[in-house]
C-alpha cells in the first residue's frame, strides 16, 4: 500500500498543501440483502432434516487514492482497491434431533487500519490512522417448526479524520462518525416449502434504515480566534418512503432602533478686509485687501421616529405613518476676532 504513494515524490519540493482523502464505498441495497436472507431460509426449510444451508459470503470493497495540491501542481496517487471477502460455513440444522434447541448467535467482525505517509525532499507527512470496523451479527436458525426467528441487525461504524504534521505545524481535519444500522425481519419457519417461500417474498415489512452523521468543524479567523461547530444530521425513514425528509422552520427577528444619528460636515468661508494707511507729508494712501478665512464644523443631527399605534381614518393603512422630531441649526456666525497692526 505504501509503495503506491511513491508517485507523489515527482516534485522536488512540495509545500504544505491540503490533505484530501476520498472514499468510494460500494454498498449492496437493503432489498438485495433481505431477499438473500429470505432465500437462504427457504432453501434450508425445503431440504431434508440433515441438509445444510448454502455458504454465506460477505464482500467489502474500498477504493482509495490521495490528491496533493501545491500552488500550481496537483499530484494524484495510484488508486488502491481493498477488497475483503469472508465466506462462512453455516451450522447444519437437524430438525429431527434438536427441535427445541436454539443455536448460538454468529458474529463476524472485520477491521481495517489505514494510514498514509507522504514524503518529499525534506518533509514527511503522516496521516492519522483510520479504523474501519464492520460487525455482522446474525441470529442462527431455530430448530422449531412454527416459531418465528428474531430480527437480524447489521451495524457499520466508520470513524474518519485526517492529521497532517509537518516540521512545525499540525493540521487536523474534522471528525466524522458514520453509523448505519440495518434491521431486517426474518422469514417465518413452516413445514410447507411453498408457504415459506410466499412469506419470504410478501412479509418483508419490518425493514428500517437509520443513518447518523456527526461533523465537527473548526473555524479560525485572522485574529487567531477559534470556533468549534458541531452539526448532527439524522434521518430515519421506512422502506416504503426512502425519500422522506423533515422540513425545518427558521425564524428571523429584526429590531430597528428608534434613534438615528447623522454626522454632517459644514465648511464656512468668510472674506475679511485688511486696510492699511500710509501718510507722507500731506498725502494719505489707503490699501485694502481681502483675506479668505475658512472653518470646518462637524454637526451631529439626531432624529427620533415612532410609529403611531392607530390612525384617525377608518380605512386600513398598508403603510404606517411615522412621526419625526426635527432639529434646526441656527445661522452660523464665525467667531472672527482679529487685530492687525501695520
From Swiss-Prot:
GO cellular component: plasma membrane; side of membrane
Signal peptide start and end residues: 1-16
Residues linked to a lipid group, GPI-anchor amidated glycine type: 314
Localization terms from the record: Cell membrane
Glycosylated residues in this chain: 25, 105, 151, 326
Induction (free text): Expression is induced during infection of reconstituted human oral epithelium. Expression is repressed by HOG1 and regulated by TEC1, EGF1, NTD80, ROB1, BRG1, and SSN6.
Name used for this protein in its record: Predicted GPI-anchored protein 54
Amino acid at each position: 500500500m505504501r509503495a503506491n504513494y511513491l508517485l507523489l515524490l515527482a516534485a522536488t519540493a512540495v509545500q504544505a498543501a491540503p490533505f484530501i482523502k476520498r472514499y468510494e464505498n460500494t454498498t449492496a441495497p437493503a432489498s438485495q440483502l433481505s431477499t438473500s436472507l429470505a432465500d437462504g431460509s427457504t432453501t434450508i426449510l425445503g431440504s431434508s432434516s440433515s441438509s445444510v444451508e448454502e455458504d454465506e459470503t460477505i464482500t467489502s470493497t474500498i477504493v482509495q487514492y490521495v490528491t496533493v495540491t501545491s500552488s500550481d501542481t496537483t499530484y494524484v496517487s495510484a488508486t488502491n482497491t481493498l477488497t475483503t471477502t469472508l465466506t462462512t460455513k453455516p451450522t447444519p440444522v437437524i430438525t429431527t434431533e434438536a427441535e427445541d434447541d436454539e443455536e448460538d448467535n454468529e458474529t463476524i467482525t472485520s477491521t481495517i487500519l489505514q494510514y498514509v505517509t507522504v514524503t518529499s525532499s525534506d518533509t514527511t507527512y503522516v496521516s492519522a490512522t483510520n479504523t474501519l470496523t464492520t460487525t455482522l451479527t446474525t441470529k442462527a436458525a431455530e430448530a422449531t417448526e412454527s416459531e418465528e426467528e428474531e430480527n437480524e441487525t447489521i451495524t457499520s461504524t466508520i470513524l474518519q479524520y485526517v492529521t497532517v504534521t509537518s516540521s512545525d505545524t499540525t493540521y487536523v481535519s474534522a471528525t466524522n462518525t458514520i453509523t448505519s444500522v440495518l434491521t431486517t425481519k426474518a422469514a417465518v419457519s413452516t413445514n410447507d416449502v411453498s408457504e415459506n417461500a410466499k412469506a419470504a417474498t410478501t412479509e418483508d415489512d419490518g425493514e428500517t434504515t437509520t443513518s447518523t452523521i456527526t461533523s465537527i468543524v473548526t473555524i479560525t479567523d485572522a485574529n487567531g480566534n477559534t470556533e468549534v461547530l458541531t452539526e448532527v444530521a439524522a434521518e430515519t425513514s421506512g422502506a416504503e418512503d426512502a425519500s422522506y425528509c423533515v422540513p425545518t422552520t427558521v425564524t428571523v427577528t429584526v429590531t430597528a432602533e428608534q434613534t438615528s444619528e447623522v454626522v454632517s460636515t459644514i465648511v464656512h468661508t468668510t472674506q475679511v478686509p485688511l486696510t492699511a494707511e500710509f501718510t507722507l507729508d500731506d498725502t494719505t494712501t489707503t490699501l485694502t485687501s481681502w483675506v479668505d478665512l475658512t472653518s470646518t464644523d462637524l454637526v451631529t443631527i439626531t432624529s427620533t421616529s415612532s410609529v403611531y399605534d392607530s390612525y384617525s381614518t377608518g380605512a386600513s393603512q398598508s403603510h404606517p405613518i411615522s412621526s419625526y422630531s426635527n432639529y434646526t441649526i441656527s445661522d452660523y456666525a464665525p467667531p472672527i476676532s482679529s487685530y492687525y497692526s501695520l
